[in-house]
C-alpha cells in the first residue's frame, strides 16, 4: 500500500503533542496550497501516525494529513473536518445531489456528477468535493483530470475517492 488511499484497518499510533514551530513548514505548505489562514496560535497541537499518513490534530480534531501521492510526492491537505473549520475556494470540485450517495459509500466520482470545479486543478492534485447546494465538504480524492476537463467532460472518472463523510477518519473519536 502506497498510502495514497486509506485502509480500514489503520490505527492511530504515536500520538504526541507538538510545538507550532516544529510543524510550521507543514502548516505553511497547507496555507499556501489552499489560500487559508489556519490561525492555530494558542491551540493544542498534536501529530499522530494514521497508517502511512501523518495527521495534525488541532484541539483534538484531525484537521490535516500529510500523505504520499500516487506519484510518490509528499502532499499536505485538510481532512473533511478541516474543511468544515477552514472554508476554502481552492481545489474544490462541486457535485450534484445524485452523486452524494455514491461518494458516501467510498465510490470514485464520475465527471457526469460534477457541475463546477476550481479551473486551476491539475491532473493528480488532491482535491475536495462539496455539494452544489450547501457547499459542505463530502469527500477528498485524487483528480484524474484537470479542472476544465472535470467541468466540461461528460464521461469517465473525475477523481479517486480516498476520504469521505462517514468513513473511519470522519467517525474517529479522539
Q: Which positions does each model-derived feature cover?
A:
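Beta-strand/loop-dominated core regions that host nucleotide or nucleotide-derived cofactor-binding catalytic loops
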Residues: 3-53, 57-115, 121-123, 129-174
Amino acid at each position: 500500500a502506497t498510502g495514497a488511499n486509506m485502509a480500514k484497518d489503520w490505527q492511530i499510533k504515536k500520538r504526541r503533542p507538538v510545538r507550532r514551530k516544529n510543524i510550521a513548514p507543514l502548516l505553511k505548505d497547507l496555507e499556501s496550497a489552499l489560500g487559508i489562514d489556519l490561525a492555530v496560535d494558542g491551540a493544542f497541537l498534536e501529530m499522530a501516525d494514521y497508517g502511512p499518513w501523518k495527521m495534525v490534530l488541532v484541539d483534538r480534531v484531525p484537521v490535516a494529513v500529510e500523505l504520499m501521492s500516487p506519484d510518490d510526492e509528499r502532499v499536505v491537505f485538510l481532512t473533511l473536518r478541516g474543511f468544515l473549520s477552514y472554508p476554502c475556494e481552492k481545489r474544490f470540485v462541486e457535485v450534484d445531489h445524485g452523486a452524494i450517495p455514491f461518494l458516501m459509500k467510498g465510490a470514485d466520482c464520475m465527471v457526469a456528477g460534477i457541475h463546477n470545479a476550481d479551473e486551476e486543478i491539475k491532473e493528480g492534485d488532491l482535491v475536495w468535493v462539496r455539494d452544489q447546494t450547501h457547499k459542505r465538504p463530502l469527500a477528498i480524492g485524487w483528480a484524474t483530470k484537470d479542472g476544465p476537463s472535470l467541468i466540461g467532460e461528460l464521461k469517465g472518472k473525475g477523481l479517486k475517492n480516498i476520504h469521505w463523510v462517514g468513513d473511519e477518519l470522519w467517525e474517529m473519536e479522539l
